[in-house]
Structures are given as structure tokens and as C-alpha cells.
Amino acid sequence: MRVAYFSPMPPERSGIADYSALLLPALRARTDVTVVRRGARRPPRGTDVSLYHVGNNPDAHGWIVDALAREPGAVVLHDFALHHLVAGVTLGRGNRDAYLDVLEREHGVVGRLLGYGVIDKRVPPLWESRALDFPLASFVLEHATGLVVHSRYVRDRVRAAGFDRPAAVVPHPAWPVPDVAPERVAGGVVIGCFGVVNASKRIPELLRATAALRRKHEQVTLLLVGPTSPGFDLDRRLQRLGLDGDGVVREEWVDERRLWALLGGSDVLVNLRHPTMGETSGSVVRGLSLGKPLVVSDVGWFAELPDDVALKVAPDGDEVATLTAGLELLATRPDVRDAMSANATALARREHDVDRVAELYVAALERTLGGGSVDDAVLHEVTAAAADVGISADSAEAREIARRLAEVELG
């Protein structure tokens, strides 16, 4: 099987570029993969299936959706809400009619009228204020012959949107832990938060919880790593909460080795967001590999993490109180941290191993090419193999096999 691989690649500053750099060696060990150069309009001649990585950043993925529209293929859908991407490749290129057409196709006349309001600046940009209500995923789904997604949440959303072609849930691959010494930024418990600093990552709530926690446990330090979004006044918030003197350590962009060092030096990792665009988190997956206890929002992919590796915080009226209580538990109970750590590393090995992920990718691509005939052949082969080794239909082994098959919507 000859695969044309469309994706951002290093040195682009993109989580999906890092993802592809991790996945490609394992995928190439199993099938013939050609990485398509950035800006290419079509796959190379002789390609059996094209694989398009699509995220919500128009700068990184605009050329990829252009190629997808010319040559349909399998899509790795890294985000479900794609409004920012669609706006970038329509309005961002001066094509307001295309933007209005997509809105009307997905949301009827109401969508089109709101689109006029956005264009005339009478309505805030929908990709900033209402992205989940107007995801515009059909812009990509209509050209996809099959999907790879990373959560049941996204699979259910695309099914609800009417997508009826193959859709496989494939875990985000885990990076091997590099030989990098952990870097401690403070002497007490360090709570690490990695990613863009803005309101949708619940940074205001995290800062309030940190301030409340430090009133009882002043040895706790919050480490914030990542760029600050324009318009988010972090310094003013720190000052208002009394965190501008100490209690918070700030880092902007860091390279890969420093990222691992700071992750390794954190005792707890926090990754919050609301709303979710259906995305996963590379820093959370790295944290699993390192065995770090997690605190996440109870939304999307994050809600699907096992309870024994992640404390979950609902983005509701009790969010700050729940977050403060969870952080206090982890800051004061090393035994709880140790138990969650062991569970996290086991999960990373069991579910997120890059070779296992590559096998699931190949199965998904073959299914995209072969459709129902491949489904039937795989099910027949698995059923026969299970019977040969004496696995009964009601056994624990059979239930585990069924769970694995369900990940790629077989069985």
C-alpha cells in the first residue's frame, strides 16, 4: 500500500508536526509512505491512498485541505471544530462567498445571515465566540473517504454530522522518554501547566485555585510554560491575585529537550480547557509517558482518560473550588501521586505505544481502501484465531478483543 502523507513537519512549530515526526518511522516500517512537500497540490503518481492531517490552524493546514478538495482521501481529524481553519482559507483569502456558502450548507439561512454579520463586523468572529455551535466540519468531511480520530467524542460528533464512511478511533502515540534530567523550578510541589496561556485553557481559574491553595500551602509553585495569547493580560491577573512576587514561574517558548526537562521536574500536570474543539494534548500524552498525575477538564478526549490517571474538573460554577480541592489532594498526598504515576505509565505503554498506533493506522487505511470486504475478512480471521486458542465468547479475553475491534468500528 503506497501512502501519500500530508502533514505539517518539523521545524514548523506545530503539535501535529511533532506528532508526525513521532509516527512516521513506525508507519514506514509497515507500509510505503511518501511525505508530500508543503504546498503540493496533489499526491504523487502511483499513490494508493492519501492521508491528510487536518487541524484548526489555517497557516499549517490550509494547503492540506486544498489538496484534499482536489483528491479525496483518508483524514486524520485532529480537531472537530474547524471554523478557524475554514475562515482562514475563505475570508483569509478574500473569498467571502465561499465562507457564506459553507455556513449556509451546514447551518442554513441562519448561518448565512450570521456570516454576513461577521463580515460586516456586527457580530464577533464565530470561530472565536461560537466555534462549537458552528464547527463547519463538513468542509473537510465531504472530501474524506475515511477518518482517523483520537476520541470517541469526535467519532460521535462526526457520526451525528452524518459521516457514514469508516471512522477509526486511534490513540495519540506516546513519545519515548528521552534521556533528559528533570529540571526543578522550585523546592516544593510544582504544578506544571504547558500550552498557550489564555482564557479557553482556563488559566484564570487555575490562577485563582493556585492563589487559594498557596494560602494554606505556600510551598506550592505553579509553572506556566507556553506563549501568552494576545489580549490576555497575565501580569495584571498575577498582580491582582498576589502571585506576582512568587508562586508562579513563567516560561515562554522552550525547545524539545527543555520541555521534557520541565515536564519531568513537575509533580503534577494540569491541562484544562473549555470549550474543547475535539483536540487531544501532546503535553498530556508526554505526561503519561513520564508517569505524571493529571488534572484535566471533564470534556471531550480528556473526559475519556481513566479516572485512575486523571482528576477531572467540570467547567461549571464549582470549577475553581473543585480544582483547588484536587490540587490540594495531589500536593499533600504523595501516596496518591505515586499510585496515579504508576497507572499513567502503564496506560502509556498499553494504549499509546507508537507501534500499536501505527498498526491501527494501517488497518484504518486498508479499511478505507477496501470497505466492507476488509471488515468481513478481518472479523472472520479474528473470530477463527480466537476459537483456535480456546477463547469463549463470554470470557474476559473475548471482551478485550471486542473492545480493541470497537476502536476501529469492527465488531
Task: Name these PLM-found stretches.
Residues 145, 261-278, 292:
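Acidic donor-binding loop of glycosyltransferase active sites
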Residues 153, 173:
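Carbohydrate-associated surface elements
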Residues 184-201, 207-210, 223:
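Conserved donor-binding/catalytic core segment of Leloir-type glycosyltransferases
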Residues 100-146:
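Membrane-proximal helix-turn-helix segments that form the acceptor-binding/catalytic region
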Residues 234-257:
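Nucleotide-activated donor-binding/catalytic signature segment of Leloir-type glycosyltransferases, i.e.
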